[in-house]
Amino acid sequence: MILGNGKTLPKHIRLAHIFATQNSSAKKDNPLGPEGMVTKDGFIISKEEWAFVQAYVTTGTGLPINDDEMRRHVGLPSRIQIPDDFNQLYKVYNEDKHLCSWWNGFLFPLVLKTANDISAYGFKCAGKGATKGYYEVMQDDVENISDNGYDKVAQEKAHKDLQARCKILIKEADQYKAAADDVSKHLNTFLKGGQDSDGNDVIGVEAVQVQLAQVKDNLDGLYGDKSPRHEELLKKVDDLKKELEAAIKAENELEKKVKMSFALGPLLGFVVYEILELTAVKSIHKKVEALQAELDTANDELDRDVKILGMMNSIDTDIDNMLEQGEQALVVFRKIAGIWSVISLNIGNLRETSLKEIEEENDDDALYIELGDAAGQWKEIAEEAQSFVLNAYTP
């Protein structure tokens, strides 16, 4: 690359110059560092965003897909019947449950592996504990090239060692790029549908959202708080309460008459008592019990509708939020794949840099300093990525 002043940039910093001129707002332009792996909010894979996704998935894996599971999920006793109309809800929940189970068993481990790849690469470049990182060893190679101008054999060896280390780093960056592409592909399937990792057709969260919206409209029309049935149930409950109150009052009055029957004398009182007990009292008792049972059933149905539809509305909201977070996650993983490509290209530029160019560049220790600065950046991102992996399941 020829600059306006006629100077030629060495190959290993050409891409950095392009970054600097095209994006003057970039905080770091070291071509050997993890540029882009850190945003203004921290590590590129945000723990807060993924915690939300995990919460959604945890809910999804526990969705009820039959009457028995629904009763346990919302706390309905076995005496309460669940109409067949709700079977359409189970079908949608089953699709979502499969997606969420696939996420937990396959996709989320890939997300963690991507973060672990970043951490492993960072520690490989920067070192960890007593283990020297590649960049520090490459600094030694650069020094050996610079200090052995009189010994071409030593220079050539140092240059070949530097190229060999670059080759290893390039190979790993390319592997991690392919892995990030794989996550993006499967994440896209999770959101938009396709085939999962086992070759099964899945409809995706977007289609689940559409299906649930249709079911929601249908069930709201049949059982929602604005439905004719709901209004009828409310009126029925109100009428039954009034009727039950009247029956209980009549029952109490009759009980008083039974007790007062003995005022007629022992013999006549006993006869009147038996007649009342066998006829009126039993009749009113049965009426009270029947009214109470009917009222309980009506209240149970109202409770059932409120609980099941309430859960459905909550899931609908969760899906809306999940799609928003999922689209952001897809952008992140596509960006990570792109970053790995740039890292591979940058280290490739260094690998292709001639021995003479390194000698010239190292007159002001630029490459040596560049490697040291990049090592510090990689160590920082490696620790953040490691923290994400270690705390991924912590709410």
Swiss-Prot record:
One MF annotation (Gene Ontology) recorded for this entry: toxin activity
Coiled-coil annotated residue ranges, if any: none
Alphabetic keyword roster: Sporulation, Toxin, Virulence
Organism: Bacillus thuringiensis
Family label: Belongs to the cry6A endotoxin family.
Superkingdom of origin organism: Bacteria
Gene3D superfamilies hit by this protein: 1.20.1170.10
Protein name: Pesticidal crystal protein Cry6Ba
